[in-house]
């Protein structure tokens, strides 16, 4: 938000040789290479400042090209004096480059336990808990399946046997009915023969009786004729 520009580094600086009003003099401390750099801590040992993009003009020196160590220090010097404003005092018209750089870069200097914390609401809501479902392997065959298949086969065999028995019973029934019909026809034939025999006997008896009657009548007429002639 409010960045301090180092004197002599930026060309055409507004305050050459001194810091602008409202910016404290940074505390210079030697690093591992005995180079004095600004401290990244404040009086309360709080890390501040976000390493962002640095203009190449700030890295370039007027006398000679800096070494890699000096370039690395120069890239960190402008951001060391940046002070974060109090909560609620953010500038709505901040540069999009700084905002995007601050939101995308994450270093140990700015990570105080909240940026990568798994207890934050955003990380908890955006990354749901993985479902601890162990992948199940191919389940073994149920021991009841062979018995069920065997029972089904037995039922099918019983059904076929019943159908065959029904067909046999129907054939036997038809045959028995035919035999009964033949026996009834034969019985009728025997009865018819008996009736014919009885009728023949009756007819013969009638004929015999008729002959006897005729003979008796002839015998009676013969004496009467003798008497008339005498």
Swiss-Prot record:
Composition bias, Polar residues: 60-73
Segments for region (Disordered): 1-103
Pfam families assigned to the protein according to its UniProt record, in alphabetical order: DUF4653
Record field: compositional bias (Low complexity): 85-94
Family membership: Belongs to the UPF0500 family.
Record protein name field: UPF0500 protein C1orf216 homolog
Species whose genome carries this gene: Mus musculus
